[in-house]
Amino acid sequence: MIDEILPKLVQYWYIVLPTLLIIKHVVSYINTQRLMRKFRAKPVTNVLNDGFFGIPNGIKAIKEKNKGRAQEYNDEKFAAGPKPKVGTYLFKLFTKDVLVTKDPENIKAILATQFEDFSLGKRLDFFKPLLGYGIFTLDGEGWKHSRAMLRPQFAREQVGHVKLIEPHFQSLKKHIIKNKGQFFDIQELFFRFTVDSATEFLFGESVESLKDESIGYDQQDFDFDGRKNFAEAFNKAQEYLGTRAILQLFYWLVNGADFKKSVAEVHKFTDYYVQKALDATPEELEKHSGYIFLYELVQQTRDPKVLRDQSLNILLAGRDTTAGLLSFALFELARNPEVWSRLREEIGDKFGLDEDATIEGISFESLKQCEYLKAVVNECLRMYPSVPRNFRIATKHTTLPRGGGPDGKDPIFIKKGAVVSYGINSTHLDPMYYGPDARLFNPDRWSKPETKKLGWAFLPFNGGPRICLGQQFALTEASYVLVRMIQNFKELELTPNTVYPPRRLTNLTMSLYDGAYIKVN
């Protein structure tokens, strides 16, 4: 029987294949409708045109990312639906249905109230070549174990210790003075500054990337195999990871020689420090003065792979997020001299300026008392969140509270395995939550009573069980550097004709695509 039918099926494949696809689609549609009724959900209000299996969407997303317009592209998608004010839309991306939301109620459900309904999905596959099995790539028990292991390393006494930052600020200051009176890219310096401070916190020994020949140092004094190419390799590897995430099911296409070479350079750099920690005797680990993240971790595990993976996960956060925040802050402060002047007044009253500046009183506690400084930092985090967009995968059939029906206020059905992306950057710039001036840099908004009630509409450090462990570390370091900049420099100036809003480079974290070219007077 089968022997008779099979040749005919093969002969008429051009009829059979489309027929099977249609049947599959109809069965899937009927099943989805049944489940929607069961969960009392409504169809998604904004369903966008997909093109051919979402392939044009995917290609456009990669092109826009490479042009520094990933966030603008996402905002355009929100505006393209029949109900633009509904903060959720559905579209295809490289054959995969993706639900994108900026609705705080949906984000709250994904990250907190329905936390168990969602996982990281294929994030481990996307990011594993570089980051391995770390706190940012693991789910379930692996993630819980990582978090339990790392949480003590971010205790208040560790993150509040600002004295380690000052020597690196002095190196940064020399570079700024070297460029006095001319425009220079301070973002490039901030990335070097944060890798210097992060490696000292993590490994007990700074990579000292700021101490170069231009300010009178010999780089050979700090050299080791893997150090020289680390920064460039780390940046390049992250670009590849960002593209792998966009490609979804086809992430494996990005696995070429250049990517592997970048990953190998980063691993060589990290392995140097891991091996030093493993080679240290228990007595050396115990008596080492000051706090060293890796030495504390070695007392919990001696697996070099675990040590490398967790260190790299934390290094990513410690370097990139703080450097991005500082760069965006200086960019906006150079654009808004009146804000810089008000900061000078506040910091001058608390810690002194210029020749009268002191650092003895700058601490975790005193920085939290600088209200206008906190407002400026919050406004930078609002407009330029370090991780502007993220995603989850549904672990079972479930719902999200809003985004369905004629007005977008009804629950929507989320099928098991569905990709759900949440766009924090789009939430932070939505007039519904921040008023008509949502796209303007305005630190004064943080003194208004309504801003205190934002809840899940302000989420610079994620939320729920996976909220960022290093939140206070990043805020303390960024605030300290801003205070020291304010104490030492009277005026900032931005390059004339600078494009605004700025183009943003979005990989695993966000930074300025064209750098932050300022002049310090």
UniProtKB/Swiss-Prot annotation:
Keywords associated with the record: Heme, Iron, Membrane, Metal-binding, Monooxygenase, Oxidoreductase
Expression induction or repression: By N-alkanes.
Disulfide bond annotation, renumbered to this chain: none
Family designation: Belongs to the cytochrome P450 family.
Origin organism lineage: Eukaryota, Fungi, Dikarya, Ascomycota, Saccharomycotina
Protein name, UniProt field: Cytochrome P450 52A9
UniProt: heme binding residues: 468
Subcellular location as annotated: Membrane
Record PROSITE patterns: CYTOCHROME_P450
Organism expressing this protein natively: Candida maltosa
GO annotation, cellular component aspect: membrane
InterPro entries xrefs: Cyt_P450 (IPR001128), Cyt_P450_CS (IPR017972), Cyt_P450_E_CYP52_ascomycetes (IPR002974), Cyt_P450_E_CYP52_fungi (IPR047146), Cyt_P450_E_grp-II (IPR002402), Cyt_P450_sf (IPR036396)
Function as written in the Swiss-Prot or TrEMBL entry: Together with an NADPH cytochrome P450 the enzyme system catalyzes the terminal hydroxylation as the first step in the assimilation of alkanes and fatty acids.
Pfam families named among the record's database cross-references: p450 (PF00067)
An example Gene Ontology molecular-function term: iron ion binding
Entry's EC annotation: 1.14.14.-
Stored Gene3D superfamilies: Cytochrome P450
SUPFAM superfamilies on file: Cytochrome P450
Class of enzymatic activity (EC top level): oxidoreductase
Cofactor(s) the record lists: heme
